[in-house]
Each structure stands twice: as structure tokens, then as C-alpha cells.
A protein has these predicted regions:
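Short intrinsically disordered, low-complexity coil segments enriched in acidic
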Residues: 1-4, 173
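Aromatic-lined carbohydrate-binding/catalytic grooves of carbohydrate-active enzymes
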Residues: 3-138, 151
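Active-site neighborhood of glycoside hydrolase catalytic domains
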Residues: 65-70, 76, 101-238
């Protein structure tokens, strides 16, 4: 997509927030088609028990109460409606109220004996650890393998605190932030290179990640969470 014209997209987030089901998403897809929109993105809330921002990050399996037929079936139906299908992830995060955190509380960035500071009810996964990266590659990559997904919104909605890793000895703790980025690049290299037909868009509370490393993997970046049409023109064009 580096040299391609990007599709016009619509995102369900501000239309539905967490309150959606399959029929509501399909209704948005049909309306998008009528308006000449080429891609519909299903944002936060499709996985785990995610009915608010208080839980389930890291549990990347479909919420069958909202989408009983699963992501692959929804993607197929959206494509049949005449628009492509995109999906939101926040892979680097984990909710304390999640199956992943309960199984692996040491997988988040933390310092033993210190309080784990939550932002937006979430913690940051420790991507300096190989097993954490392996989990993301297998889980996120598996979803993309199984469904007709044309776009991924890769979100990141908090800053890092308590910079420590349970996978490093005390004398190497200062390596953690650098090793985190190496781990993230490995995850992106595996997932992006395995899915060359998917458009990946970086997002971090808006445009918080305009760095060369992310731009290498993400040919599109969400510029700002300010969606006022006039203000957005000033933001995007300086």
C-alpha cells in the first residue's frame, strides 16, 4: 500500500461504541456502500467480554453474544455487501480483568513489589519476552489467516510505566525498553510480511507514533482523535 491510493473507510466506533451486533454492523456496511465508502472497520468491542473498556484486552477471541457466527462470517457478509472489511486490535495491551492476565500476570511490564499503574484500565504487555511476542503472532496472525480482512487498525492507548521485566535479571533491566521495541518489530515483521494484502494503520491516541520504525510497517497512520472536519484539515495539512 505504500504507493497505492488508500480506500475510503468508515469506522463504527463513534456510531455504536461497544453497543453493536452483527446486524447493526451489516447495516453500516450497506449504508457505507450506498455512500461510496470502500471499507468498513469494526473497532473495539468484538472480543472477549468487552462491553466496556474495563476488561478483555488480550483475549482475542470473538464475543459470540455480539457476533454469534464469528469474525470470518461477518467479514464475508460485509464483503458480499460490496465493501471491504477491517478490524481493530490493541495487541500490546492487556486488561487486568482478562483471561490472559489471570493466566500470565507476569507478562505485563512491571517492577516486583510496586503497584502496577493502570491507564484506561489496562497494562502494557512485555514485548521484550519471546513468549509474549509468540502469543501475539499466533493469535493476531491466526485471525487474519481465517477471515477476509483487508485492513487492521493497530491501536495503543497508554504510555509505559514501571519499566521492568520479569524475563530479565536485575543487572539487565535497563535493556527492557529497547528490547520491547525489538520485540514489537519482530511481531510486526511476522504479521505484516505474512499478510501483504492487508493495509495496516497505526494509531496511538491519535498520532502518537509517527516514528520511522512504525512507518516502515504501517503505511497509514491515524493522525488525531480529533474528528472535527475543519480542525482535522488543519491537523493533517499542518
Amino acid at each position: 500500500y505504500r504507493d497505492e491510493v488508500r480506500p475510503i473507510l468508515a469506522n463504527n466506533w463513534e456510531a455504536t461504541y461497544f453497543d453493536f451486533d452483527e446486524e447493526k454492523i451489516l447495516g453500516l456496511a450497506r449504508t457505507a456502500k450506498e455512500l461510496g465508502i470502500e471499507l468498513l472497520v469494526l473497532d473495539d468491542g468484538w472480543f472477549g467480554k468487552r462491553n466496556s473498556d474495563t476488561c478483555s484486552l488480550g483475549d482475542w477471541y470473538v464475543n459470540k453474544e455480539k457476533l454469534p457466527d464469528g469474525i470470518a462470517a461477518l467479514a464475508q457478509k460485509v464483503n458480499e455487501a460490496g465493501v471491504k472489511f477491517g478490524l481493530w486490535f490493541e495487541p500490546e495491551m492487556v486488561s487486568p480483568d482478562s483471561d490472559l492476565y489471570r493466566a500470565h500476570p507476569d507478562w505485563c511490564i512491571h517492577i516486583p513489589g510496586r503497584e502496577r499503574t493502570e491507564c484506561r484500565n489496562q497494562l502494557t504487555l512485555d514485548l521484550s519476552r519471546k513468549e509474549v511476542c509468540d502469543y501475539l503472532i499466533k493469535t493476531i496472525g491466526g485471525i487474519l489467516d481465517q477471515a477476509e480482512i483487508s485492513y487492521v487498525k493497530w491501536d495503543m492507548n497508554r504510555h509505559m510505566t514501571e519499566l521492568g521485566s520479569a524475563g530479565l535479571p536485575p543487572e539487565r533491566q535497563k535493556e527492557m525498553p529497547h528490547r520491547y521495541m525489538l520485540g514489537l518489530y519482530r511481531v510486526l515483521e511476522e504479521i505484516v510480511s505474512s499478510h501483504p494484502d492487508v493495509l495496516f494503520e497505526s494509531c496511538s491516541g491519535g498520532g502518537g507514533r509517527f516514528d520511522a520504525g512504525m512507518l516502515y510497517y504501517m503505511p497509514q497512520t491515524w493522525t488525531s482523535d480529533d474528528t472535527d472536519a475543519v480542525e482535522r484539515l488543519y491537523i493533517q495539512y499542518g
